[in-house]
Amino acid sequence: MERWVKATLPMRSLLQAEAFISGCAAHFDRSLAGDQLSPVRTSTQCWCSNNECSADPRTAAVERRISNLTRAPVRYMEPFQILKYEPGQFYKVHHDQNSGLFTPQGPRVYTFFMYLSTPAEGGGTRFADLDVVMPAVKGNAVIWPSIMDASPSRDEPYTNHEAQPTTVGRKYASNVWVHQFDYRTPADKGCLLTHKNTH
């Protein structure tokens, strides 16, 4: 069976990358690992939701582009999670699937990860089981599965990954997690199962 991560170009203009960074400039907090603080993840994060980031038409255009590429409705996606890594910050090896099968949104099917800046050194995304490191290059993106195509109840075992430390310069990046079902309707109604580790 083929194990894969795929590189793609989600942004038609690098100005779209700047929209995420400027829209989140005043909203960064310590990143969570799942739903809690952890020493395995030391970056800061901003959710592109109900703020300047989500109001920018350039970020909405990227959202539609990802919907077209994944063939998943926008409502199946979590909001963009914007990440900022200062030199030395990291996210140790982890898996992105943290959403239980019993939740209204179902499991995370795909991760769509975009690089919003190019640090001078370091900051790649490493897939240890695949012996692959994707370099952090502004405007590029990587997509990978979190569950098995033939058995959605099983995690994809080959997409454990880590954010390698940026050694020179700052890295900005963004996650988009695509679910099996509609994520935003229950989230907008305040369903706690959309905000907690349930897997």
Question: Where do the PLM segments sit?
Answer:
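Fe(II)/2-oxoglutarate oxygenase catalytic core
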Residues: 1-143, 147-199
